[in-house]
């Protein structure tokens, strides 16, 4: 699957600040977005949306593209033709008008200097290596900033496909292959040959609580199904 970078300047976009705030509060999707490199876009691809223009700038959304591109009227008064759009569904959204710290164009440029993170055409495709690196940077950033989810400055859907497998494996290895709640670990009991079985039973899951210093914790299925009110699973 491919990864595309979308740009949003609320100062000139038909998707205004007020529309964003309304969608953010209701946890609604923006619907669709325009793509400059539209030829190969398909359902299942990933998008990141970067806010540019005035005020705080940086990544404010990550999600999944839900359709191939289709031609429609220009969203701007310029009446350009043709303009191609694809439907998008947001998995993670951050309010740039809150106190949440964004993953800024400057930080992205320092890590991925071969892409213009400050603006330009929306809907540009990243190459595979750059897309994988961006995923690692993004989920590390989220992991280090859990308070924005507790403070309702951001929201996230707990989907099984939320974390890419390459990132998930690194998170599991980084903290050990056991559950961080109960310590459940196949390899510790049955030996290293069974380590791979943990992938089905232990995975990084997003939690929100004012006392937690990380967002993602390796949790087994049993602990993940603890009664509501006992844990802070992000829904």
List the predicted regions and their residue ranges.
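Compositionally biased, charged N-terminal/linker segments
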Residues: 1-43, 109, 126-146
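Short, charged beta-turn/beta-strand-edge "cap" motif at the junction between a beta-strand
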Residues: 51-56
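Aromatic- and Lys/Arg-enriched surface recognition patch
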Residues: 58, 64-125
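Short conserved catalytic/interaction loops centered on acidic-Pro-aromatic/His motifs
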Residues: 73-75, 189-196, 226-235
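Short, charged surface segments at domain edges that flank catalytic/cofactor-binding sites
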Residues: 145-191, 206-212
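Histidine-centered catalytic micro-motifs used for acid/base chemistry in nuclease
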Residues: 198-205
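Polybasic, low-complexity binding patches
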Residues: 206-218, 225-235
């Amino acid at each position: 699957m491919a990864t595309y970078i979308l740009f949003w300047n609320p100062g000139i976009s038909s998707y205004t600040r007020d529309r964003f705030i309304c969608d953010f509060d209701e946890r609604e999707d923006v619907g669709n977005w325009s793509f400059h490199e539209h030829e190969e876009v398909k359902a299942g691809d990933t998008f990141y949306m970067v806010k540019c223009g005035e005020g705080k700038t940086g990544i404010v959304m990550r999600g999944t593209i839900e359709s191939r591109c289709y031609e429609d009227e220009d969203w701007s008064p310029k009446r350009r033709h043709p303009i191609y759009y694809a439907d998008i569904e947001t998995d993670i959204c951050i309010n740039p008008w809150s106190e949440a710290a964004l993953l800024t164009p400057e930080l992205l440029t320092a890590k991925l200097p071969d892409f213009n993170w400050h603006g330009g055409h929306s809907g540009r495709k990243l190459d595979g290596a750059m897309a994988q690196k961006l995923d690692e940077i993004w989920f590390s950033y989220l992991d280090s900033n859990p308070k924005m989810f507790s403070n309702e400055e951001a929201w996230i859907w707990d989907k099984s496909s939320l974390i890419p497998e390459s990132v998930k494996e690194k998170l599991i290895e980084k903290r050990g292959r056991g559950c961080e709640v109960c310590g459940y670990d196949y390899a510790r009991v049955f030996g290293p040959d069974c380590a791979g079985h943990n992938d089905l039973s232990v995975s990084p899951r997003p939690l929100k609580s004012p006392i937690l210093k990380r967002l993602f914790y390796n949790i087994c299925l049993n602990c993940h199904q603890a009664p509501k009110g006992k844990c802070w699973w992000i829904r």
